[in-house]
């Protein structure tokens, strides 16, 4: 065998995936693989047995998911290049934008391809400690649209809203965040098809409060 190589414990991987599948089955939610965190496509066939699809942070990850992982394909990027939109609209089921301006500019192409457009929001609710520089809800963050920046006129273009504010955290942080999301954006929920809770949920960690997650 050629070295170096990556060695995956399939039994451990499946144990974690079983935990996630249990959450899916008990709640009806969808769980996606965040390729930014794990993109070893050799095990994508195993992951596809348990999860609903994958998320991408740009065109190349979107291609990888389309080629190697059966299921839904979602993409979010802080900004898109105009020339990438046609391929993203072909490859992805959901294309999530970071600003109302990019949504207005590119969502019509996504909708014309029969796909769904979303918008990342900033609930302005920080639950992280020790690494404020990475906090999407931190001061001067450009990740997501605040309520003050949100323009209700874009609602006809939207299928859903997306937030990503956690980092390897427990479900109490999600509960706090959801309260803030509902307080700031709840008035728009009735017209939406979905709400994406983003990543950073350490669900497979020993001691994670899964019942609380499922109540959320």
Model-found features: residue ranges?
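Active-site-proximal beta-alpha core segment in soluble small-molecule metabolic enzymes
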Residues: 29-194
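A short small-residue
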Residues: 1, 159-164, 198-201
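Generic N-terminal amphipathic, Lys/Arg-enriched alpha-helix
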Residues: 1-7
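Acidic, glycine-rich loop-and-beta core segments that form the ion-binding/anion-interacting portion
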Residues: 178-216
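Soluble or luminal CAZymes and related metallo-dependent hydrolases
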Residues: 12, 98, 212
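A short, N-terminal amphipathic alpha-helix
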Residues: 16-25, 64
């Amino acid at each position: 065998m050629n070295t170096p190589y990556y060695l995956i414990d399939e039994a451990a991987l499946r144990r974690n995936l079983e935990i996630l599948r249990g959450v899916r089955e008990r709640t009806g939610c969808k769980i996606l693989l965040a390729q930014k965190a794990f993109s070893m496509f050799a095990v994508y066939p195993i992951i596809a047995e348990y999860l609903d699809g994958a998320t991408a942070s740009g065109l190349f990850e979107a291609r990888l998911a389309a080629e190697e992982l059966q299921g839904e394909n979602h993409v979010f990027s802080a900004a898109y290049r105009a020339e990438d939109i046609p391929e993203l609209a072909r490859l992805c089921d959901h294309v999530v934008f970071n600003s109302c301006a990019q949504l207005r500019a590119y969502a019509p192409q996504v909708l014309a391809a029969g796909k769904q457009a979303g918008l990342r929001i900033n609930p302005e609710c920080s639950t992280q400690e020790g690494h404020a520089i990475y906090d999407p809800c931190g001061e001067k963050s450009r990740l997501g649209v605040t309520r003050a920046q949100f323009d209700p006129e874009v609602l006809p273009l939207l299928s859903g809203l997306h937030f990503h504010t956690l980092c390897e955290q427990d479900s109490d942080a999600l509960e706090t965040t959801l309260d803030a999301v509902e307080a700031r954006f709840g008035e728009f929920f009735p017209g939406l098809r979905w709400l994406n809770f983003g990543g950073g949920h350490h669900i497979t960690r020993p001691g994670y409060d899964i019942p609380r997650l499922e109540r959320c």
